[in-house]
């Protein structure tokens, strides 16, 4: 699924998107996207570029979390058995993209069926995350059911100190909308 940032979508497409209903709204985190891959019979975290140095660090860190009760690899295996892929954001000082995070976290973003491309519903994702004691991305239910344009305006007016939101539209398209706070913080770095 292709994610678009505002400004990446052409004017004609933007006019069409503006009235689309927001199906799901979640927090946009500042980190490195990783996902589960079954490699030689072993579940691993990979980045979009493959089994990189960052992926090695994520895997090491996730193994260490087992002693604290989180079972990241159990979640990956359960999702794989259902023919799906879990996507996470790796955040913290070791993966700073724009803003320094104090705490290292691996946050479940979504789970998607590999064949149909269907995203699991929010309740399934939350129950899976809870079962394996894995943190799940924050949702903004107050934005759901509204048009993209309404949500875009609300996010821009928000005083929330967050990067922004990821919106899944009724068409299945995903769009990232950045907060004014975030854009100001990035410009002043």
Language-model region placement:
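Core nucleotide-handling region used for phosphoryl-transfer chemistry
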Residues: 1-189
């Amino acid at each position: 699924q292709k994610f678009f940032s505002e400004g990446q979508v052409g004017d004609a497409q933007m006019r069409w998107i503006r009235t689309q209903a927001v199906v799901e709204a979640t927090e946009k985190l500042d980190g490195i996207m990783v996902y589960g891959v079954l490699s030689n019979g072993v579940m691993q975290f990979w980045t979009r570029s493959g089994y990189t140095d960052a992926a090695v660090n994520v895997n090491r860190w996730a193994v260490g979390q087992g002693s604290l009760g989180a079972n990241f690899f159990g979640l990956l295996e359960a999702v794989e058995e259902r023919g799906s892929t879990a996507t996470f954001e790796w955040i913290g000082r070791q993966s700073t993209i724009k803003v320094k995070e104090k705490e290292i976290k691996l946050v479940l973003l979504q789970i998607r069926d590999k064949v149909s491309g269907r995203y699991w519903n929010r309740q399934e994702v939350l129950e899976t995350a809870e079962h394996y004691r894995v943190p799940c991305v924050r949702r903004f239910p107050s934005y759901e059911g509204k048009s993209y344009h309404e949500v875009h305006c609300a996010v821009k007016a928000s005083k929330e100190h967050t990067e922004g939101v990821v919106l899944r539209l009724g068409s299945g398209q995903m769009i990232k909308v950045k907060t004014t706070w975030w854009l100001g913080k990035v410009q002043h770095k």
